[in-house]
Amino acid sequence: MTQFVIDNGGIMGQFIKAGKVNDVMTNSGISKVKDDDKSLYRVESIYEGSSNYSLVNDVPTVSSYYSITSGNISETMESLENSDIFTAVWTKDLSRRTGLMELAGVKYYLKRGSGIDLTSVPYGYKLKDTLETKAEDENNDNVYLYENSLALPLVYGYDNYMKKSDWDSLDSYDKENAMLQIAVVQDDMNGELKERTPSCNSVVVVNKKKFMSKLKKMKLPNMKVKGDKITVKSGMVKIPISFKGIANSETHLNIKGIDYNHFSDEYVKEKLKASDISQDERSDVIYNKRVDNFYLGGIINDKYAGFNYCTKYYIYNGAKSTLCNYGYNKNSLKEAYFYMSSPGVYTFDDIKIVCQPMDNYKKYVKKLKLNIKNLEIEHNKISYNAKLNNKKLICTAVPYSKGWSAKIDGKPAKIIKTNGMYMGVVAPKGNHKIEYSYVTPGLGLGSALSLAGWLVTISLFIIFRRKKNTN
């Protein structure tokens, strides 16, 4: 078996020799985590080559590529404008966004590379170890293993809530910050918990007007900016954006309402007739109509924080907005890059650079932490003991499904879809045993119908057999 990559010209550009695939796909960092820590947690591994590396390495991660992915997950990821989603069923990771990783129960973060780029390490993660692994070219590569010093378990609790309809009106970076403070639920909780508005302290450091002004001043030979329309004539455009960031912040490039169009037929004809067109531009003009997906977004310290935009001609997931993470910086960030990798015509409803200060982060995480013991996940069951100082909505960071049922101290409890994709139950003050069990929705009815079908088939067989013998 050979794993390979085909470039735009239909030429094999990268391959892994048969028999070597497992060496490349098996992550030595994950192996060490599994050996050293037997508790329950998730891992995020950036720049992994395989889609379902969690299955290969037998460890829970935040990456998934399944055709049966819950719509709750894909819809929430799109609402949060996660830049690392690709089609509705493929979430590569959580794009190093500290809050999302915290709420998903991520305890360890791994990155490959020849150097430690601190901007690709989320807030609160400390270097634990440096290991050696195999790169895709079969040479040795480094894996840096980080541990979340503020890690929440897969179970945490809220004192307050907000309705999802109110949450939907927030910007994606404020949505993430809101979930660190209060639970997001679908409906009014009728007095079980107090409704509250989250505190949002994000700061827009470059708005669309300033951003477009910076693009116009660049005067690149392969880019033209007219009004809000950006035309990339050929190749890739990489533009430095200088700004005054905020210290102790996670910085994001937020692009909303992405609209991409191929070159018009008139433009193509005009360009191909021109005598001064370069060979590279000619190739890009000819190939442009075949572009169905490409990257655009941010670059920081030569690390790409891009979004894989899909046109309507590809496996389109409908996402037209993205939040690209420039990373956490202890000092204020002064410059980052914006890039568009495909020739064509771009417009954006909004494009801005936003800083999310982490000043209150430790306080939020501390408040979410519960006294949880004996947390166990086995097959279709989850159980744990919780000691609560007051009434809480206890969130379990496992994907919500109608197939789950819950009990508190042996009595049935209502499951509340929490934060768009997780499960929650409301429990009063005191010591409690929380249990979840899962049965595939429709399994009982399906089994009954299958059994009925077999009984009918057998009955008909017996009837026809008797008639035949009688005749």
Can you name each region flagged by the protein language model?
Residues 202-471:
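Active-site-proximal, structured, solvent-exposed surfaces of multi-pass membrane proteins
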Residues 1-219, 234-235, 290-350, 354-360:
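Conserved luminal/periplasmic juxtamembrane motif of membrane-embedded glycan-processing enzymes
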